Amino acid sequence: MVLGGLVVSSSLAAPLAAQPAAISPARRAVYDSYLNFDPLVQGGRVVPGWIPGGASFWYAEGGPNDRLLHRVELATGRKTPLLDVERLRRSLTEQMGHEPAGRGVPFAQVAFTAPQQLRFELEGDTWQLDLATYALSRLPRPTANEGDRLATSELTRQRPQPFWQESFTGGGETRNLERRSPDGRWYLGVQGHDIALRSATDGRTLMRTTDGTADSLWTVETRRWEPWSPSGTRFVAERHDVRGMQRMLGAQWLKMFVEPLETRWTRAGGVLQASSLHVLDVVWGRPVALNLGDTRDSYLQVMGWLPDESRVLVAKYDRLLHSVEVWAADPSTGEGRVIMSERSPTFLTNHHEVVWGDDFPWTMLPDGTGFLWRSERDGWDHLYRYDLNGRMVARLTQGSFPVTSVVRVDQQRGWVYFMAQGDPARPYDRHLYRVPLAGGGTAQRLSEGAGVHEVTMCPLADCFVDSWSSPAGPPHTVLRRSDGAQVTALGEASIDRLRRVGWTPPREYVVKAADGSTDLWVTMYLPFDFDSTRSYPVVEFLYAGPQVAVRPTTFAEPGPAQYNRALANLGFVVVTLDARGTPGRSKAFHDVVFRKWGTFEIADHAGAIRQLGARLPFMDLTRVGIWGRSWGGHYALRALAQAPDVYSAASVEVPGFDPVGNQLYETYLGLPQQNAALYDQANAILLAPKVRGHLRLMSALSDVATFPETMRMSEELVRLGFQHELSIFANSGHGQVGQTARYNDEQRTQFFVRHLRP
């Protein structure tokens, strides 16, 4: 067993008589290089910074040793240096008393304070540069005798600071950043159980509430939506009554004397926190509670303030996410009314998006006359325009494709710019489109090139910067006008370093789901020295839950894809697919999971492996492993139980096994009090007697959601006499970072090397 990085013997660990096959140093070196993939791909993606006046932008190119900053004119695409590197470095050397590091621009971020003046940070100081004369001044640091409030640097005072607050949907406290008011005077956050404002001028703190307690506490959302009114004089905060919620017990195991921890948690069918929204003035008055009806067993999301601050719009989802109401509330009196509602016979959205995500289905119109609403009511995610009385003004998009987000509403010119997966030949590619705001028009595709596009609209919405890539296609970036016409190419990634290390382009395949008709897309990573005449073991990575799609669709896909790219270079074929029941396709594709959890997913995945193996003789289907995290861990365990003829080894990490343990399942199964049979069907612990092959379980003591279920599964396997490996990390939660993550990756790698023998 692994406890906090210490390897100790355990009666649960499988015998390790079969030692890992030798991995050559050269192959291991390629694997290690791929674990830090980004430096192998140079350039290609441009992140614009807008220059005052709106006629140009700047961007950084190159690494720390040879960085350059470019200016691009929007009208012509003309690119010129933003900075004269020699003059800049000469001025810095004179002011600092030594030459700055590297050969290029020694900083990557600038902030314009005037059209010809910018600020930057270097070696702990804030500098101001005059672009006309290259006069350089170091901004003074406050001295200690200016008082504690001013002893912090101006840069610190002018930046949002982190704060911690309770998250009842995620378990325990979460780290957040303060939100700056639109007038720039205040930063909004939380101290203890109360709302705090920090002055951007002198750093003083003003407590706007003082009655918060552990059972009745205040929080503020600073990441997912805008709490501030347009004038910066008022803001929306939440209050939560958490009495009745279950208390999950844990501990700080690495202290000299173990310290107990307690976390509020909601199991399926259990008590949710009772939340309410309140409007607070910056400096005076009592909080005004918004009257949104009965908010128990609900999720509340602030859609936004109207420009004249006469109303706050709020989306109120029911507990099962089967219905939503849009409320308009008066921030001065709190009085509210329902202006629009929608219901679904299955679910309106997935639980992750409502609880944690920021991909909301609404977009407020800039002039305050209404909002855009995304809905799957016709079977695909499409855009509808509503006024403030809840009347549908126009349907904006239609067709057999999903809209994924709204990029910009240009009311002056009458356009809505949005991202959608509208290419039927490549249904996961994402492109930019536009459609008339008035409705009645056909969507125009504005981006070109296969892959996933990320766009940044210019401030005046007359152009956009478009970066895209695909699994085998390195990043490109171009500047386009708002009608899609290309102005200039800005960058194409160089993969020379990657080729020198060794690279085989990833492949994409299409297979059929277990229903025999639905297309499933696969991304496959191959060894750098791939030889189609050889036979390779296979490792599948999966998530399979209804919350997210995980198949890599970009070139330098982050997260688990980075590990999977590296793993392939040890001599594996690594595949990932999103089966039925996952988001990103049609509503029918997603709805397969509704009330059918555990009945189809592994059939889709195992069927895909069989089809690929029949088509590709280099895949050795006698050596197939699988791994996943969270619900991916749940389904990796199911793979050993439901398809042991395909999968022979599984690394099951921070898994949720018993659906009663987490309210996330309610959206798809209903409440357990009325749907006990569905919860039994979804309970992977009941599959323990059917598990075959080699199993590695991994969990973490601070993961209040899944650690108990991992231990229950392990104990059940012990009772059955099934040998398995168990890794437990002491100072880690549901996600592993830093050395813990690296250690876990290495354990997983050795597990697959040992049992699949590449």
Feature map (PLM): residue ranges:
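Generic low-polarity alpha-helical segments
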Residues: M1, E178-R180, R208, E226-W228, ...
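Bacterial N-terminal signal peptides
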Residues: M1-S11
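Hydrophobic/aromatic residues in well-formed alpha-helices
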Residues: M1-V2, R28, Y679
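Prokaryotic Sec-type signal peptides and long signal-anchor helices
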Residues: S10-S11, E61, H351, R499, ...
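Low-complexity, intrinsically disordered segments with a bias for serine/threonine
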Residues: A13-P15
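Beta-propeller folds
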Residues: A17-P475, L479-R480
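Serine-hydrolase catalytic core recognition
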Residues: Q301-G304, E309, A315-Y317, V452-P758
